[in-house]
Amino acid sequence: MTDAAEVLVLGECLQGQLIPITGEIIAAGRQLADELGIELACGLIGDDLDGAARAAATLGADRLYILEDPLLAGFQSELYLEAATKLCRAVDPRVLLMARTPIGRDVAPRLAARLRVPLVQDCLEVKIDASTKQLLATRPVYGGNAMATVRCTQNPQFATVRPKVYNPLPVQDHRQGEVIPIQVDLDPAMGKTKVVSMVKEESEGVKLEEARVVVAGGRGLGGPEGFRPLQDLANALGAGIGASR
């Protein structure tokens, strides 16, 4: 492996603002960078990212790589992948982390293929082996009945991290990271899809994907009427409300 000098996390933004999972993977990356004695960088892909860059710095990133283009304002898989590939090839990180989100599930496997490196997905823990300085990534296997710890031996040592595994670090308003813009030249023809409209879903209470406690029901409740007591309980607990499949 080359002696690459950074841990790189690929953050996610919505309308130019960090989404909560980015704080979680910055925390995971900060731990790894400290164990390795190297710097932590956060890559942000989108448009109008000044606010997101400032927020990422206050959460623990030393360096911010910014890839802005109006074509990246809304997620389009092929364009996002092109930008992520350019970033990783330019930076050549030692460790690369993404969140196990819909974007991470879409992009990470194809990014790994482009970089010609293995990928460990859906990790519950990432840490550095003190003796080899290699990434150890722990993930569930056999339907969650066992855990496997995978040693990564090729740079970038690439893993996706499950949401809600790491807590974001406390915000430090005084932190200011180094901001480095990276030019990304995108051709609209690269995209195989087109965003024609965006509809914001309004929901009451805690969003399910952000909830630390979930109150769930199943078919036995019979229908919407049966879920109303669960909603009251969820409100009392500050929980999200879900359903079994």
Give the ranges of each region predicted by the language model.
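N-terminal glycine-rich FAD/FM-binding segment characteristic of electron-transfer flavoproteins
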Residues: 1-245
